């Protein structure tokens, strides 16, 4: 009887856990869908920024901007990294992969400055004595363009003050629902050739804007304004991709956990039925034995 009760208690515990994992899967699926819609809504705006920058570069050629100039006079350049991790676990290998990738990137640098988003990464890097910028504390849940603007206003101000010389962002790039990999992008200083490549500009590129587009007060001023918006757009995109990757990883992990719970329940149900049959057989045998003894 004790064995049967143990199986029943274990089955009850697994059913309760299954309810939790299934609920987490559904929540992650809803968040994933919402994040994708956010990115789709913002895409036309950033596409317009991109096309306008490309048009100015095509018409004006070379543009002078402080975010394009490498600080060559410095031999020992200070590097900074924006690292996007999750707020919590239960997301498969999502956090482990991005932290491991970040540590590999940091091996070649001397005391890099880290802007860590997400409690998992923040706690890890603080625990391991990395140079984490303490005033940078932003949630990664439900990323918004307003948050990306606020983040980059702080970081661009530090770059202008020469607190660091180069800036990179490390995030999880979502190639598809089944393929997600940690990635790194150099944000500052911008490289004109790389930017032209991202803006899809080459020698045969035609004018993106038809007719004679005029920029007030001048193309260079407009370009300088758009550069900051472009950088913020890249950061926003990285936050949304990381968030969708995290939710997708959690949804997959919870789906697997729910499936494993179902498998365990099937096995335990079989064990329970066998134990119950064995108990009934034992009871019948004892009754028959008792009846025979009374004859």
Curated annotation (Swiss-Prot):
Q: Tell me, what is one Gene Ontology molecular-function annotation carried by this entry?
A: ATP binding
Gene Ontology process terms (BP): proton motive force-driven plasma membrane ATP synthesis
Q: Which UniProt keywords apply?
A: ATP synthesis, Cell membrane, CF(1), Hydrogen ion transport, Ion transport, Membrane, Transport
Q: What is its main location?
A: membrane
Q: How does it sit in the membrane?
A: Peripheral membrane protein
Localization per Swiss-Prot or TrEMBL: Cell membrane
Which GO cellular component terms, listed alphabetically, does the Swiss-Prot or TrEMBL entry include?
plasma membrane; proton-transporting ATP synthase complex
Fetch the Pfam families from UniProt: ATP-synt
Which family, according to the similarity comment? Answer: Belongs to the ATPase gamma chain family.
Job of this protein: Produces ATP from ADP in the presence of a proton gradient across the membrane. The gamma chain is believed to be important in regulating ATPase activity and the flow of protons through the CF(0) complex.
What does the subunit section of this Swiss-Prot or TrEMBL entry state? F-type ATPases have 2 components, CF(1) - the catalytic core - and CF(0) - the membrane proton channel. CF(1) has five subunits: alpha(3), beta(3), gamma(1), delta(1), epsilon(1). CF(0) has three main subunits: a, b and c.
The name this protein goes by in its record: ATP synthase gamma chain
Q: Which gene encodes it?
A: atpG
């Amino acid at each position: 009887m004790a064995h049967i009760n143990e199986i029943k208690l274990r089955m009850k515990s697994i059913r309760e856990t299954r309810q939790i994992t299934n609920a987490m899967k559904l929540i992650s699926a809803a968040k994933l869908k919402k994040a994708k819609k956010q990115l789709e809504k913002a895409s036309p705006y950033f596409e317009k920024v991109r096309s306008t920058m490309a048009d100015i570069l095509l018409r004006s050629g070379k543009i002078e901007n402080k975010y394009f100039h490498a600080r060559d006079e410095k031999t020992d350049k200070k590097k900074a990294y924006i690292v996007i991790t999750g707020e919590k676990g239960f997301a498969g290998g999502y956090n482990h992969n991005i932290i491991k990738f970040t540590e590999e990137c940091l091996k070649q640098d001397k005391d890099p400055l880290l802007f860590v988003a997400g409690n998992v990464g923040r706690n890890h890097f603080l625990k391991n004595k990395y140079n984490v910028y303490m005033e940078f504390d932003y949630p990664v849940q439900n990323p918004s363009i307003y948050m990306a603007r606020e983040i980059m206003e702080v970081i661009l101000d530090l770059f202008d003050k020469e607190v660091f010389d180069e800036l990179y962002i490390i995030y999880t790039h979502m190639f598809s629902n089944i393929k997600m990999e940690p990635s790194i992008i150099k944000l500052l200083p911008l490289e004109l050739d790389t930017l032209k490549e991202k803006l899809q500009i080459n020698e045969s590129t035609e004018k993106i804007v038809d007719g004679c587009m005029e920029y007030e007060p001048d193309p260079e001023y407009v370009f300088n304004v758009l550069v900051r918006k472009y950088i913020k757009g890249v950061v926003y995109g990285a936050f949304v991709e990381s968030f969708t990757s995290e939710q997708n990883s959690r949804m997959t992990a919870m789906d697997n956990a729910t499936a494993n719970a179902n498998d365990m329940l099937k096995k335990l149900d079989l064990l329970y039925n066998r134990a119950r049959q064995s108990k009934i057989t034992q009871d019948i045998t004892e009754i028959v034995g008792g009846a025979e003894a009374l004859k």
